[in-house]
Amino acid sequence: MKSRCQKGDKDLSLRVALYIKYNNGKRKMINLQKTDDVRINAINELLPPIAHLYELPITDKAAETVYQTRCEIADLVHGKDNRLLVIIGPCSIHDPKAALEYAQRLLPLRKKYEKELLIVMRVYFEKPRTTVGWKGLINDPHLDGSFDINFGLRQARSLLLELNNMGMPASTEFLDMITPQYYADLISWGAIGARTTESQIHRELASGLSCPVGFKNGTDGNLKIAIDAVGAASHPHHFLSVTKTGHSAIVHTTGNPDCHVILRGGKEPNYDREHVQAAVAQLAKSGISTKLMIDFSHANSCKDFTRQMLVAEDVAAQIQAGENNIMGVMVESHLEEGRQDKPEVYGKSITDACIGWDTTEEMLALLAKANQVRV
């Protein structure tokens, strides 16, 4: 009787254990359904960076273009070169063919003014949004809401490779911790925008980027957040990202000594002599490089693309008057002036309005002439 009872107890224990295991598992599944990914519609696999780097490897010519330009920009940031850095190009790239034509037109001017200007093409693939809208070539390369990001990343790298192979260095804005692994080796200068300058993640990112980086003042005109960002990015950081093979990883950086601030305006423009000198004083007090860049667009142009030339004229006059702390400028320029909602006109922006090619040539001539006093 005792033995049967022991056997029965064992059977009962097994049944109870299985019951508890089953019910706990079921309960866990129900809980996960209630708490995990409740607002995720779908998750699609992304090709790892190495797939694109293997298919589109950097060439010797492209590497030379990037390395040389990075060194030259670093010299500008630290006052070892008196040329003026000009970051110029479309607000955002939506048509690689038009971008290449723009580069082919810009290349002779880069050569023509190489003693006065260091011209780097603006090649922005991601568009930060205040609310919603098209987020750029990487996010939606077909402009149809299909969000073919794998194709967008490949297209971005392909364009950058072609630009650098022709000797045209590229600049871009960095928005996250993952996309730089796909094409940062082809970027000569990077920007952290006004909406992300105060973000700890972006300061950490800048500390590990291999290129010089500019931080814009805040959208309200606050310069201190950009100054703090430059200081933070110069130090080592430790953060989460992915490896070239796509694995989650902890990244340890050395710090980036080649960062600077960008004046882009805020509640009012901040490109004039008074604002520049006030910014220089703030930079000096903070103990970082007093060399700064001026964005001709955004709040400095009051969001009127035609005013970019007025800003250029003011900055050119400051340079001719002996202002040595303006080390660079940013210009939104395209083949055709203005903007459009849909890509109907070739070479015209579908995001922020840009100056056209004729005005671009005039502006570069103006800036080169003004900077002759420094070189």
Which positions does each model-derived feature cover?
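Conserved, mostly hydrophobic/aromatic
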Residues: 89, 294, 356
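Conserved phosphate/anionic-ligand binding catalytic regions in large, soluble enzymes, centered on
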Residues: 85-95, 352
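N- or domain-start disorder-to-order transition segments that initiate the globular core
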Residues: 40-77
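Intrinsic-disorder-associated, low-complexity terminal segments enriched in Asp/Asn/His/Tyr and depleted
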Residues: 9-11, 19-23
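Glycine-rich anion/phosphate-binding loops
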Residues: 94-111, 147-155, 313
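Active-site-facing alpha/beta catalytic cores
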Residues: 30-35, 116-271, 275-276, 298-299, ...
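Internal helix-turn-beta structural module
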Residues: 333-371
